[in-house]
Regions:
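Extracellular beta-sheet/turn segments enriched in Thr/Pro/Gly and aliphatic residues
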Residues: 4-50
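Amphipathic alpha-helical repeat scaffolds of TPR domains
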Residues: 30-60, 64-67, 73-93, 113-128, ...
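Alpha-helical repeat scaffolds
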Residues: 57-71, 97-109, 133-153, 175-198, ...
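Extended, charge-rich alpha-helical scaffold/interaction domains
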Residues: 82, 199-218
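Short alpha-helical linear motifs
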Residues: 128-130, 209
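Long, compositionally biased low-complexity segments enriched in polar/charged residues
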Residues: 143-151, 155, 162, 169-173, ...
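Short, low-complexity, Pro/Ser/Thr/Gly-rich segments in the mature regions of secreted, periplasmic
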Residues: 236-246
Length: 247
């Protein structure tokens, strides 16, 4: 209907990524982004599960079959998306030691400093690993990491966005120094400003454009590579690929 533009950053998992469109029973359109690899799909399904017990069951079954160290280790592979996915699952479903998983977050954020999610995980590791006497320094470093994540832009995974909000709330209410609480409140203001427009596409994060011509359902071909057009009615989803002439 040309009513909105919804955007998502697609994680390019090793082995491939699928982007699926489906009809919502209410007549809208659902978007799901997931890895092609079946084991990685398990991680994605666990993380995107709306029911915590269901996700916990998927994660527990996964960790019985597959050593988590195969995905989270000091030798960060050229697939940061799966590393992030596994770390996020370890945070949400702590059937393994969360600290064990997050010990590699500094290396992840160093190698892939352009991925906002890596800085969110770094902040999480700093906060849960701090000794009582190190709380002030840990809070300052965590705030720096969360500010970096926010300035880099939208995260790739919806749960990263949830964690960012949770940590800012905790720091706003309980950081050891007043200046840190003030900084967390300021960051919280930036984050919550766009809260009504935030969505999820499977385990991936998506958001609805909320201002200007970009919010009216059309993509400007000067700034977008349009691969396909589609339409939805009560029972059918039609996708038509764009065929561009070869020069």
């Amino acid at each position: 209907e040309g009513l909105r533009v919804e955007r998502t950053l697609v994680p390019l998992f090793a082995g491939g990524t699928t982007v699926e469109f489906a009809l919502d029973p209410s007549g809208g359109l659902l978007l799901d982004v997931a890895p092609v690899d079946l084991e990685k799909q398990s991680l994605s399904r666990a993380l995107s599960s709306a029911v915590g017990a269901e996700g916990q069951g998927i994660w527990s079954d996964f960790t019985r079959r597959t050593p988590v160290a195969a995905y989270i280790s000091g030798d960060i592979p050229e697939d940061p998306w799966t590393v992030i996915l596994a770390m996020l699952c370890a945070v949400r479903f702590p059937s393994i030691d969360e600290r064990e998983a997050l010990q590699w977050a500094p290396e992840l954020s160093r190698q892939f400093a352009w991925i906002p999610d890596s800085h969110v995980l770094l902040a999480r590791g700093l906060l849960i690993g701090a000794a009582p006497e190190d709380r002030v320094g840990a809070a300052s470093e965590a705030l720096r990491a969360l500010s970096t994540a926010r300035r880099l832009g939208a995260p790739y995974f919806a749960y990263s966005n949830t964690l960012l909000g949770d940590m800012l709330t905790a720091l706003r209410d309980g950081a050891p120094e007043a200046e840190q609480r003030t900084q967390a409140t300021k960051e919280m203001g930036y984050w919550s400003r766009h809260l009504p427009h935030q969505r999820a596409a499977g385990s991936s994060f998506s958001w609805v454009m909320s201002s200007g011509a970009r919010s009216r359902g059309g993509l400007d071909e000067r700034y977008s590579s349009i691969l396909a057009f589609g339409s939805v009615d009560a029972s059918t989803l039609t996708i038509t690929p764009v065929v561009k002439p070869i020069d």
